Amino acid sequence: MIKVFVVGYGTGYASWIHDKKIVENIEDADVVVFTGGCDINPKLYGCAQHESTSFSRQRDDFEVQTYKQVRPDQVCYGACRGAQLGCALNGAILVQDVSNHWCGGTHDISRVFGEEELPEELAVPSLHHQMMYPYDLPKEDYDLLYVSKHNRSQYYHGDKITDEKVAKLREIGEPEVVIFHKDGNPVFFGVQGHPEMLSPDHPTNIVFNKILRKLIHEQHD
């Protein structure tokens, strides 16, 4: 049984996790879930606010303080905003505005070379206008598992999103599933999409459950 603590509101964000129990205290959890919602404050990743960005300083402060309570033997999971928060708290920045990712349905994501044990393609629901940008981090601080099957956005806007960074997005791909494992921080499983909008037995969630269980096992070893 996986013990899950959901930060703030929205226990439905954990609906895709198999064989779980929602717990009321973070210290009892195997997994700490950071949910979706509004954008995060760009100050969290050292950038100026783009005109399209809207955030709740109160929520940001609460979730950052909660993140600081997570132990090394616990795993963080974030969906959409939650993944972006994890990205920022591990030292990376965000693209503050993109197109064609608020699709109201699913789109395909593709496995990144080197992760052959994972299926080549998965489908994820997508409802976001911002995007993780982990590519400036040291390679040992993260694993890029999936990117958009095709680069969907027509533009990438935001402070510090230079032509060089745009070129990396077009070359490597638009990040969809990233595991952050910076030394000194808890492991953070970030999913840009919304697996909670799929049934728990959907093929995508079968894969995500395997990933999550592997991370939990590794932290308990």
List where the protein language model places each region.
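Flexible gly/pro-rich beta->alpha loop and the following alpha-helix that scaffold active-site loops
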Residues: 18-77, 90-91, 95
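Glycine-centered loop/turn positions within well-structured domains
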Residues: 84, 92, 130
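Amide-donor transfer/coupling interface in amidating biosynthetic enzymes
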Residues: 6-9, 27, 34, 56-72, ...
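Glycine-rich nucleophile elbow surrounding the catalytic serine of serine-hydrolase chemistry
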Residues: 79-88
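Short, charged N-terminal beta->alpha structural module
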Residues: 1-21
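Active-site neighborhood of phospho(di)ester-bond hydrolases with catalytic His/Asp-centered motifs
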Residues: 78-79, 193
